[in-house]
């Protein structure tokens, strides 16, 4: 089970503390919290009182007290020392793409506790990366995987179990086993997409959630909120969705991968006019940003355009029948 830190210990050391240990949380309240998908302190500590009140059917004042107590017991929300943060960083795992050039570009692989945005034009290979990492996530840790379950939110009807089967066989894996650990839902509009993020939280009990994929993140928002008059509302909704995804990454020590569409800036005087959808909201929410483009001979180019700790750079790889390869 996922564990949370106590105030008496170092900020990120884990020990088994249950929601019943919170002051004022009796059996009835604990049952409501669990029915709403809250099993641990960290999940409560990152909620807002209004959201917790709505999800768990509690009063807002009660919710505020529960959240405050959870933050105190998990020692979240105050200043911490740099060495404590370094200890937290040691918990980060890396999911290998099993493509050496991509792993080298990312300093060893795709980090957990991070939101990775992959953007590019149609046919640049965004969905292929999502499928490949979904397969790889089910691998044992000593083989570059996370030995975890994957949740895949499909907004464009592009998930193909047949492709997962091809990639699994390319790694010598049992396709049925791999598919059993990938949980897929089709999102039909932006509201449904946001609800599915909440559903992941509820379904995570009993599963080792290690990866969440949204393919693609912005397509519904872009189609439903049209024109400058709707831009502020679109960005507000998108920001809320991104925060929910980041919470899932933090609470589960998981990787969130989102694919994104692009548009061309006709007024660009120099450089590449291709820009990702989502504006500054998505740019600030993304921990890492990868820009994919096609190259000659069926090759793809991945460029790391934003990272908190790695230099910009690019690599070349191929999409084959068996999956991604150098």
Give names to the regions the model predicted.
Residues 1-12:
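Single conserved hydrophobic/aromatic residue that forms the stacking wall/gate
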């Amino acid at each position: 089970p996922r564990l949370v830190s106590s105030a008496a210990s170092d900020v990120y050391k884990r020990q088994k503390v249950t929601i019943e240990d919170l002051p004022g949380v009796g059996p009835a309240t604990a049952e409501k919290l669990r029915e709403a998908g809250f099993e641990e302190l960290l999940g409560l500590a990152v909620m807002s009182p209004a959201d917790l009140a709505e999800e768990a059917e509690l009063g807002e004042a009660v919710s505020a007290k529960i959240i405050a107590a959870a933050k105190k017991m998990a020692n979240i929300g105050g200043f911490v020392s740099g060495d404590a943060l370094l200890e937290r960083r040691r918990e980060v795992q890396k999911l290998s793409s099993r493509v050496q050039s991509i792993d080298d570009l990312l300093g060893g692989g795709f980090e957990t506790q991070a939101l990775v945005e992959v953007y590019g034009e149609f046919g640049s290979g965004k969905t292929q990366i999502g499928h490949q990492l979904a397969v790889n996530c089910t691998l044992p840790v000593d083989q570059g995987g996370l030995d975890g379950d994957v949740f895949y939110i499909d907004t464009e009807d592009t998930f193909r179990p047949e492709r997962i089967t091809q990639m699994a066989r390319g790694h010598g894996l049992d396709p049925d086993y791999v598919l059993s650990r990938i949980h897929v839902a089709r999102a039909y509009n932006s509201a449904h997409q946001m609800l599915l993020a909440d559903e992941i939280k509820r379904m995570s009990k009993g599963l080792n959630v290690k990866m969440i994929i949204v393919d693609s993140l912005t397509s519904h928002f872009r189609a439903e909120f049209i024109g400058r008059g709707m831009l502020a509302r679109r960005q507000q909704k998108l920001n809320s969705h991104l925060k929910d995804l980041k919470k899932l990454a933090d609470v589960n020590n998981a990787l969130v991968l989102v694919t994104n569409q692009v548009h061309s800036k006709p007024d660009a005087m120099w450089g590449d006019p291709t820009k990702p959808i989502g504006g500054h909201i998505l740019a600030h929410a993304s921990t890492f940003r990868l820009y994919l483009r096609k190259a000659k001979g069926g090759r793809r180019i991945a460029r790391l355009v934003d990272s908190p700790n790695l230099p910009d750079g690019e690599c070349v790889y191929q999409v084959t029948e068996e999956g991604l390869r150098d």
